[in-house]
Regions:
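Append "Primarily bacterial transcriptional regulators
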Residues: 44-52, 57, 61, 95-102, ...
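Terminal helix-turn-helix DNA-binding modules in bacterial transcription factors
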Residues: 63-102, 124-127
Length: 127
């Protein structure tokens, strides 16, 4: 009789602290941040580092963030660049290399697209 009662109880799944999507995204963010200074960081490198296929990375990042993986990597780099510039410890050129860019004009263009001002203007506004 006890056995029947136990069998009739609903099976409770352990409560997960994070959803699978949150785990996926936090893992991707960690990988991007860990390898941001590498100018070779791209979607293929991210696939290699994470062990996840290109198609799956694209689909999941697009679904969770609304951005393509390329846009997401670039956006993460720009946010990190803004944070580094706010610290006032580094020059624009140093920050550019720290977030994986080697072309100053392209870095400036991407930064301006993200924040509406050049890195130099951003730095001057923060002073």
């Amino acid at each position: 009789q006890v056995k029947k009662q136990l069998e009739s109880l609903p099976v409770l799944k352990p409560i997960e602290a994070e959803s699978q999507d949150e785990k996926f995204l936090s893992n991707i963010i960690r990988l991007i941040e860990d390898h941001l200074s590498e100018s070779e960081l791209n979607v293929n490198a991210l696939c290699e580092l994470s062990g996840i296929s290109n198609k799956q990375i694209y689909r999941k990042i697009k679904q969770l963030t609304g951005m393509s993986p390329v846009e997401y990597i670039k956006s993460t780099g720009m946010k990190k660049a803004a944070m580094l510039l706010q610290q006032k410890k580094f020059t624009v050129a140093e920050v550019m290399y720290m977030v994986g860019f080697s072309n100053h004009s392209y870095f400036s263009k991407c930064f301006q697209a993200e924040f509406g001002k050049t890195p130099r203007q951003y730095l001057n506004d923060e002073l």
